[in-house]
């Protein structure tokens, strides 16, 4: 398998737990020749609590389920109208560390938004992407066997009110913002298409192979 090939899977809207378990399965079963993949998905409303998550940051979940997961970071929200992207990357094979992967992901979002004349930036002390101190994208990864899973969530055109039920990423009073308000991509499909371009460029992938949905083998 060429190290310069990235397989991009478009999953549509999928239940969070089924995609999470599929990511785990792919990571656990992959070997040195397994292709790197980027999964593009939307989830129904769900709060996910990272390994470092504290329960006091979940203020009033109401009817939205809370799932404890095995990624870094604190609590965040996923829902329709949000682009979620999961990079399943063999960072050992790419000879980069997790910090570099985080930087590459953040830069991919920043560069994508720059194409819409939106000035975004990352913060060294608080992973994610921001515009005028408001957070537009959240980030949480897990590395296992030298390979990444979990990923990023970019707010595109969604109901933002569930963020008020939590302290997003563990920060009380953190204001969230979405691309629609900023003049960025207006649909999840558009955002996904643009993110694939900047992400694949930043990670050095020269060939893209596109798939719809998940196959049993993920190949």
Swiss-Prot record:
GO molecular function: lipoyl(octanoyl) transferase activity
EC numbers for this chain: 2.3.1.181
One GO biological process term: protein modification process
SUPFAM superfamilies xref list: Class II aaRS and biotin synthetases
Site (Lowers pKa of active site Cys): 135
CDD domains: LipB
Active site per UniProt: 169
Keyword Flavoprotein: no
Misc note: In the reaction, the free carboxyl group of octanoic acid is attached via an amide linkage to the epsilon-amino group of a specific lysine residue of lipoyl domains of lipoate-dependent enzymes.
Compartments where located: Cytoplasm
Family: Belongs to the LipB family.
Function: Catalyzes the transfer of endogenously produced octanoic acid from octanoyl-acyl-carrier-protein onto the lipoyl domains of lipoate-dependent enzymes. Lipoyl-ACP can also act as a substrate although octanoyl-ACP is likely to be the physiological substrate.
Identification of the protein by name: Octanoyltransferase
Binding site for substrate: 71-78, 138-140, 151-153
Pfam families: LplA-B_cat
Pathway: Protein modification; protein lipoylation via endogenous pathway; protein N(6)-(lipoyl)lysine from octanoyl-[acyl-carrier-protein]: step 1/2
HAMAP family recorded: LipB
Chemical reaction(s) catalysed: octanoyl-[ACP] + L-lysyl-[protein] = N(6)-octanoyl-L-lysyl-[protein] + holo-[ACP] + H(+)
Chief localization: cytoplasm
Domain BPL/LPL catalytic: 32-207
InterPro entries listed in its UniProt record: aa-tRNA-synth_II/BPL/LPL (IPR045864), BPL_LPL_catalytic (IPR004143), Octanoyltransferase (IPR000544), Octanoyltransferase_CS (IPR020605)
Matches recorded under PROSITE patterns: BPL_LPL_CATALYTIC, LIPB
EC main group: transferase
Gene: lipB
């Amino acid at each position: 398998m060429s190290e310069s090939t990235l397989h991009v899977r478009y999953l549509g809207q999928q239940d969070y737990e089924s995609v999470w378990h599929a990511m785990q399965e792919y990571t656990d079963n992959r070997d040195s020749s397994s292709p790197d993949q980027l999964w593009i998905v939307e989830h129904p409303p769900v709060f996910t609590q990272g390994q470092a998550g504290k329960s006091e940051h979940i203020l009033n979940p109401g009817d939205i389920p809370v799932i404890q997961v095995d990624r870094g970071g604190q609590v965040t929200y996923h829902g329709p109208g949000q682009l979620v992207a999961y990079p399943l990357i063999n960072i050992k094979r790419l000879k980069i560390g997790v910090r570099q992967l985080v930087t590459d992901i953040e830069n991919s979002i920043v560069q994508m938004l720059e194409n819409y004349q939106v000035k975004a930036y990352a913060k060294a002390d608080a992973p994610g992407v921001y515009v005028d101190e408001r957070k537009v994208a959240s980030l949480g990864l897990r590395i296992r066997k030298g390979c990444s899973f979990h990923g990023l969530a970019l707010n595109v055109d969604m109901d933002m009110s569930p963020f008020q039920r939590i302290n997003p990423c563990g920060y009380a009073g953190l204001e969230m913002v979405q691309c629609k308000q900023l003049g960025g991509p207006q649909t999840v499909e558009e955002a996904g298409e643009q993110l694939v371009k900047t992400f694949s460029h930043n990670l050095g992938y020269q060939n893209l192979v596109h798939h719809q949905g998940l196959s049993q083998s993920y190949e």
